[in-house]
């Protein structure tokens, strides 16, 4: 296949890799000049090995997650691969839930080590066979997984350095009390030849009349 590949060539590669659903991939999509593959999570090691050894995708660029809370298997685990020789990228997606571990691909791409730790830290996705699956971005004892859709925007605790105690302290988040903000601008409507009457302007209007 010539690279960069045309849409039809990517379609042909997708059909070849899916192979009637008998291989490690169950579906494919071509969009924006890139091929995305989907498959069962338990065959991800087989699938990535095939792409590395038979199709020249030597580099794992990233592993990321997507959260769909309304889905039974709420997470997509997305693997981004790069071929140096063909100058092309390919994407592989598998689905996972909160209880079922995805096989680790550190045996295929050793740099998956930290990527899988990040996915575990941010989404709570477990990777079976990972050599050291622990948090990598959040602090020790952190509660929850920040990139889940149901994680609160403010988090659960505030972490700061207390200069008096000379140590890091954890405190419950102190949210701002609800307020009825007035966003009305006195300049709104000026370009149309009038301006709104703001609270407190009533006396001025009465004096004019």
Curated annotation (Swiss-Prot):
Function according to Swiss-Prot or TrEMBL: NDH-1 shuttles electrons from NADH, via FMN and iron-sulfur (Fe-S) centers, to quinones in the respiratory chain. The immediate electron acceptor for the enzyme in this species is believed to be ubiquinone. Couples the redox reaction to proton translocation (for every two electrons transferred, four hydrogen ions are translocated across the cytoplasmic membrane), and thus conserves the redox energy in a proton gradient.
Reactions it catalyzes: a quinone + NADH + 5 H(+)(in) = a quinol + NAD(+) + 4 H(+)(out)
Compartment list: Cell inner membrane
Membrane topology: Peripheral membrane protein
Listed HAMAP family: NDH1_NuoC
Pfam family, one: Complex1_30kDa
Gene: nuoC
Assembly behavior: NDH-1 is composed of 14 different subunits. Subunits NuoB, C, D, E, F, and G constitute the peripheral sector of the complex.
PROSITE patterns attached to this UniProt entry: COMPLEX1_30K (PS00542)
Gene Ontology MF: a single term: quinone binding
Source taxon at top rank: Bacteria
InterPro entries membership: NADH_DH_suC, NADH_quin_OxRdtase_su_C/D-like, NADH_UbQ_OxRdtase_30kDa_su, NADH_UbQ_OxRdtase_CS
Keywords carried by this UniProt record: Cell inner membrane, Cell membrane, Membrane, NAD, Quinone, Translocase, Transport, Ubiquinone
Xref: SUPFAM superfamilies: Nqo5-like
Family the UniProt entry places it in: Belongs to the complex I 30 kDa subunit family.
Species whose genome carries this gene: Phenylobacterium zucineum (strain HLK1)
Descriptive protein name: NADH-quinone oxidoreductase subunit C
The EC number(s) this enzyme carries: 7.1.1.-
GO CC, one annotated term: plasma membrane
Cell inner membrane listed as a keyword: yes
């Amino acid at each position: 296949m010539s690279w960069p590949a045309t849409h039809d060539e990517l379609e042909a590669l997708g059909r070849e890799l899916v192979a009637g659903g008998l291989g490690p991939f169950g579906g494919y999509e071509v969009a924006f000049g890139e091929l995305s593959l989907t498959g069962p999570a338990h065959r991800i090691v087989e699938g990535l090995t095939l792409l590395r050894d038979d199709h020249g995708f030597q580099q794992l660029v990233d592993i990321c997650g997507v959260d769909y809370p309304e889905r039974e298997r709420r997470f997509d685990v997305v693997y981004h691969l790069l071929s140096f020789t063909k100058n092309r990228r390919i994407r592989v997606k598998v689905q996972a839930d909160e209880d079922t571990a995805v096989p680790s691909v550190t045996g295929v791409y050793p740099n998956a080590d930290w990527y899988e730790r990040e996915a575990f830290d941010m989404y709570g996705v477990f990777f079976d066979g990972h050599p050291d699956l622990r948090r990598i971005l959040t602090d020790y004892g952190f509660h929850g997984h920040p990139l889940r859709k149901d994680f609160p925007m403010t988090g659960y605790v505030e972490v700061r350095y207390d200069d008096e105690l000379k140590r890091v302290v954890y405190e419950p988040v102190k949210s701002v009390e609800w307020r009825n903000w007035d966003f009305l601008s006195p300049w709104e409507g000026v370009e149309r030849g009038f301006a709104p009457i703001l609270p407190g302007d009533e006396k001025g209007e009465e004096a004019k009349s």
